[in-house]
């Protein structure tokens, strides 16, 4: 939704035109669609987004957009609707506490901010997305602060979630542990 806001000129100097974004929400529909590499991904209005969602500009908007009550309500409805069609594995900062509080399996993956920033920075560099490590680290820390202190659906571990510190694990090790 942050990408949509940018593409439709609803963001000016980091400030979102909330009224216009709220008007657009009913037209934003989510579905499952085959992605560029053949995997099934979530699509918005039949478009699958990839690398364009990993930019610093989008990352800086995520927590701001997530704090808008109408956006949270719309996303909640859309995410729950998607799960009715098939079993899903979703990640997100409130998936186990708000979106699917009764999910059969919940994992709360965590790592030190510096480790998460290194991972994000390496991913961005590998994909040619410009950013400095300092910028990425600042974004990780700020998102954690904003998400854990927001009024609506703050970042929190669900009581029944298994917490896993992935600081010393690679993707394959985490996947093997979860399976």
For the regions a language model picked out, list residue spans one by one.
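N-terminal phosphate/diphosphate-binding loop that engages ATP/GTP or pyrophosphate donors
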Residues: 1-54
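Glycine/charge-rich, flexible interdomain linkers and switch-proximal surface loops
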Residues: 24, 38-41, 92, 98, ...
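NTP-dependent small-molecule kinase module
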Residues: 43-53, 59, 121-127, 146, ...
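Residue-level signature of catalytic and energy-coupling elements of molecular machines
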Residues: 46, 75, 89, 140, ...
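ATP-dependent NMP and nucleoside kinases share a basic, alpha-helical "lid"
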Residues: 50-62, 66-127
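Anionic, Ser/Thr-rich low-complexity intrinsically disordered regions
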Residues: 94-95, 101, 108-118, 127-139, ...
């Amino acid at each position: 939704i942050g990408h949509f806001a940018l593409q439709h000129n609803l963001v000016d100097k980091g400030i979102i035109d909330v009224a216009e974004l709220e008007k657009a929400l009913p037209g934003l529909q989510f579905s499952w669609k085959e992605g560029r590499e053949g995997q099934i991904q979530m699509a918005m209005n039949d478009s699958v987004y990839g690398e364009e969602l990993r930019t610093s500009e989008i990352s800086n908007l995520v927590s701001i957009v997530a704090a808008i009550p109408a956006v949270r309500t719309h996303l909640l409805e859309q995410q729950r609707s998607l799960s009715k069609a098939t079993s899903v594995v979703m990640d997100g900062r409130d998936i186990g506490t708000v979106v699917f509080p009764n999910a059969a399996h919940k994992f709360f993956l965590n790592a030190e901010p510096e480790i998460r920033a290194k991972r994000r920075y390496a991913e961005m560099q590998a994909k040619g997305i410009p950013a400095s490590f300092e910028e990425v680290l600042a974004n990780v820390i700020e998102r954690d602060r904003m998400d854990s202190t927001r009024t609506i659906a703050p970042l929190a571990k669900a009581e029944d979630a298994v917490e896993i510190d992935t600081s010393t694990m690679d993707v394959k090790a985490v996947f093997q542990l979860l399976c």
